[in-house]
A protein has these predicted regions:
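Inter-motif core of Ras-like GTPase G domains
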Residues: 92-113, 125-141
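Extreme N-terminal, non-catalytic leader segments
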Residues: 1-65, 197-203, 207-213
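A cross-taxonomic marker for long C-terminal extensions/tails that follow the last structured domain
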Residues: 177-215
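Beta-strand-loop-alpha "switch" segments that mediate conformational coupling across diverse proteins
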Residues: 157-185
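Conserved C-terminal guanine-recognition region of P-loop GTPase G domains, centered on the G4
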Residues: 122-165
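Conserved Switch II/interswitch segment of TRAFAC-class P-loop GTPases
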Residues: 105-120, 146-150
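Flexible, charged surface loops at secondary-structure boundaries
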Residues: 1, 59-63, 99-104, 134-135, ...
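Glycine-rich phosphate-binding P-loop
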Residues: 64-88
Length: 215
């Protein structure tokens, strides 16, 4: 078995979700240092488990400071795009800038905290860690998929996935947005503001007093 817990097979993860009561809960991120770059020895996933790629051609796209890559439908990439000026939803694909056309795109993975979302995030993390994707991964945003606390089995799975990316932000459920309220940092939880502040500093995203609303 690999020394990196997050590199265990997806089958093992599914077994744990199906029968969590048979196992003693453990925090498998103890003493685990999250990777900040692709890791030697990580095997590229099979083709069916890889994400598509979008080539970045226009200057407007190349100037994008942060790309939100939703790893499944409904992950929330377009919602986050509205909250951060200078960012863009990647359309569920790796944004790839041609060699010599500019620095590698900065990417934040986005997933919901249900089992399907966490499995998709794990696949994206493995693909990045293999070194096959020419992007700079900033981290992973885990958006709550429902109100309330995350079930224990999913919480353990989320910790497993978190061990394979540079940084993780966990954002709570926002009922007002679900009911149609404008997506705005002014009405967002503090965890959202902390995420945006970090990216503004790390990725040199301009600060704006203008909020973005759905069209």
């Amino acid at each position: 078995m690999s020394g990196n817990p997050w590199l265990q097979s997806l089958e093992s993860d599914l077994e744990e979700l199906e029968a969590p009561e048979q196992r003693t809960p453990v925090d498998r991120r103890v003493d685990l240092v999250p990777p900040v770059a692709p890791q030697p020895g990580v095997v590229l996933s099979r083709a069916a488990d890889r994400f598509p790629r979008r080539e970045i051609y226009t200057s407007l796209e190349r100037d994008t400071r942060v790309w939100w890559l939703g790893v499944h439908g409904g992950a929330g990439e377009t919602t986050l795009e509205q909250l951060l000026e200078g960012s863009r939803a990647a359309g569920h694909a790796w944004p790839v800038i041609a060699p010599g056309e500019g620095p590698a795109a900065r990417v934040v993975l986005v997933a919901r905290t249900h089992a399907r979302g966490l499995r998709a995030a794990q696949l994206a993390a493995i693909e990045w860690a293999s070194g096959d994707v020419p992007v700079r991964l900033e981290g992973l945003v885990l958006l709550a998929d429902a109100p309330g606390r995350l079930p224990k089995a999913l919480k353990q799975f989320s910790r497993l996935v978190a061990g394979g990316v540079p940084r993780v932000w966990e954002l709570p459920w926002v009922e007002e947005w679900r009911l149609g309220a404008p997506v705005s940092e002014d009405t967002a939880p503090k965890d959202v503001s902390r995420l945006l502040d970090h990216l503004r500093t790390a990725c040199l995203v301009p600060t704006s007093s203008t909020n973005h609303h759905p069209s």
